[in-house]
From Swiss-Prot:
Assembly and binders: PP2A consists of a common heterodimeric core enzyme, composed of a 36 kDa catalytic subunit (subunit C) and a 65 kDa constant regulatory subunit (PR65 or subunit A), that associates with a variety of regulatory subunits. Proteins that associate with the core dimer include three families of regulatory subunits B (the R2/B/PR55/B55, R3/B''/PR72/PR130/PR59 and R5/B'/B56 families), the 48 kDa variable regulatory subunit, viral proteins, and cell signaling molecules. Interacts with IER5.
Gene3D superfamilies, A to Z: YVTN repeat-like/Quinoprotein amine dehydrogenase
Superkingdom per UniProt: Eukaryota
Keywords: Repeat, WD repeat
Protein name: Serine/threonine-protein phosphatase 2A 55 kDa regulatory subunit B gamma isoform
Keyword Repeat (UniProt): yes
InterPro entries: PP2A_PR55 (IPR000009), PP2A_PR55_CS (IPR018067), WD40/YVTN_repeat-like_dom_sf (IPR015943), WD40_repeat_dom_sf (IPR036322), WD40_rpt (IPR001680)
Tissue: Highly expressed in brain.
GO molecular-function term, one example from the UniProt record: protein phosphatase regulator activity
Role noted for this protein: The B regulatory subunit might modulate substrate selectivity and catalytic activity, and might also direct the localization of the catalytic enzyme to a particular subcellular compartment.
Stored PROSITE patterns: PR55_1, PR55_2
Length: 447
């Protein structure tokens, strides 16, 4: 995979020309739709930007279309909870696309408290020739109307309209960390630190609580929910991860309140590796079902793990993302970096996995060849047709010319949010306030 990934080129990068990064511009989520033709990003300023893939050029039929801005809208505004005297941030925590049912597209976006359903439609025609209205829409003087005409549709410049269809509020006491659309295309779930709710997409005033781990006495609280996702094919199954590093697979057919899991996936801790930071670094920051539905991918602070749904005792694969940080956990704890929540992603065939790291690095692991590569998303590599070169972090004194010392890593540059096109080798990488989109130089599989 190393050699093949070597030849990946940048497709497009969307760079905001700021000499400084404003907090509102920091990208907080990235998500392809089910066809990969649209890509949505959310930021800390509550905005959603949708990119659309351009059609392939007739002059170069084998060249891939690039992604251009399709629509931008303000999804959430800052609010204030007067009962609790708390500010509610406008930051977009998650975006999830709904499967397309007609010409329009729909997506869910959420901040800490409120989930919204948006409809995206196109208009390239407008009616003309009204009998009682003029071109500006004003009513005509009826005495001047002497004939009856049939209104016609005339072409116009393409207009993309985004409208809010539903607002799902008051469902969560704690901060929402994830949303997931069910395969039945009628329901979705939202999870906060202690509860998971099931919603119907057409009903906004009530939801069903399907998981509640809040203890009677909050002093007895030992773990929180960190992420959740529906199974891609079985609408009754979902998984949620915890800050203790465990995964619980639940079946909604068993009970209305899924307090008792169907399966518990947990890796026994090695006593020799026990330290003050063990529990913090074992917290699962993201969980993703494979496209096949057979496996689950989880990310904790130092590793990504692949779990087989049929084997609860331990993961079938473990990949070290940045093991060289193990000796620096103390300083990472002091700077709060140890609490960073990295996401992970599968490629379309479930054969390669991807996750982010520090210094604007991101990692890819080929499950078949067991090869891995470290790549960098940077302004230097953002020129069209630029080739990404593998990077290497060294720990000891000896290092090659292009190696980077672990002591020179920039921990303010972190890639937390990544997404992979559902069918092709196209990836989206959010690096602070910049979005990078990379694709294969040739239309071939990575491995």
């Amino acid at each position: 995979m190393g050699e093949d990934t070597d030849t990946r080129k940048i497709n497009h990068s969307f760079l905001r020309d700021h000499s400084y990064v404003t907090e509102a511009d920091v990208i907080s989520t990235v998500e392809f739709n089910h066809t990969g033709e649209l890509l949505a990003t959310g930021d800390k300023g509550g905005r959603v930007v949708i990119f659309q893939r351009e059609p392939e050029s007739k002059n170069a039929p084998h060249s891939q279309g690039e992604y251009d801005v399709y629509s931008t809208f303000q999804s959430h505004e800052p609010e204030f909870d007067y009962l609790k005297s708390l500010e509610i941030e406008e930051k977009i925590n998650k975006i999830k696309w709904l499967p397309q049912q007609n010409a329009a597209h729909s997506l869910l976006s959420t901040n800490d408290k409120t989930i919204k359903l948006w409809k995206i439609t196109e208009r390239d025609k407008r009616p003309e020739g009204y009998n009682l209205k003029d071109e500006e829409g004003k009513l005509k003087d009826l005495s001047t109307v002497t004939s009856l005409q049939v209104p016609v549709l005339k072409p116009m410049d393409l207009m993309v309209e985004v409208s809010p269809r539903r607002i799902f509020a008051n469902g969560h006491t704690y901060h929402i960390n994830s949303i997931s659309v069910n395969s039945d295309c009628e329901t979705y779930m939202s999870a906060d630190d202690l509860r998971i709710n099931l919603w119907h997409l057409a009903i906004t005033d009530r939801s069903f609580n399907i998981v509640d781990i809040k203890p009677a006495n909050m002093e007895d609280l030992t773990e929180v929910i960190t992420a959740s996702e529906f199974h891609p094919h079985h609408c009754n199954l979902f998984v949620y991860s915890s800050s203790k590093g465990s995964l619980r697979l639940c079946d909604m057919r068993a009970a209305a309140l899924c307090d008792k899991h169907s399966k518990l996936f947990e890796e026994p801790e090695d006593p020799s590796n026990r330290s003050f930071f063990s529990e913090i670094i074992s917290s699962v920051s993201d969980v993703k079902f494979s496209h096949s539905g057979r496996y689950m991918l989880t990310r904790d602070y130092l590793t990504v793990k692949v779990w087989d749904l049929n084997m609860e005792a331990r993961p079938i694969e473990t990949y070290q993302v940045h093991d060289y940080l193990r000796s620096k956990l103390c300083s990472l704890y002091e700077s709060d970096c140890i609490f960073d929540k990295f996401e992970c992603a599968w490629n379309g065939s479930d054969s390669v996995i991807m996750t982010g790291a520090y210094n604007n690095f991101f990692r890819m692991f080929d499950r078949n060849t067991k090869r891995d590569v470290t790549l960098e998303a940077s302004r230097e590599s953002s020129k069209p047709r630029a080739v990404l070169k593998p990077r290497r972090v060294c720990v000891g004194g000896k290092r090659r010319r292009d190696d980077i010392s672990v002591d020179s890593l920039d921990f303010t540059k972190k890639i937390l949010h990544t997404a992979w096109h559902p069918a092709e080798n196209i990836i989206a990488i959010a690096a602070t306030n910049n979005l990078y989109i990379f694709q294969d130089k040739v239309n071939s599989d990575m491995h």
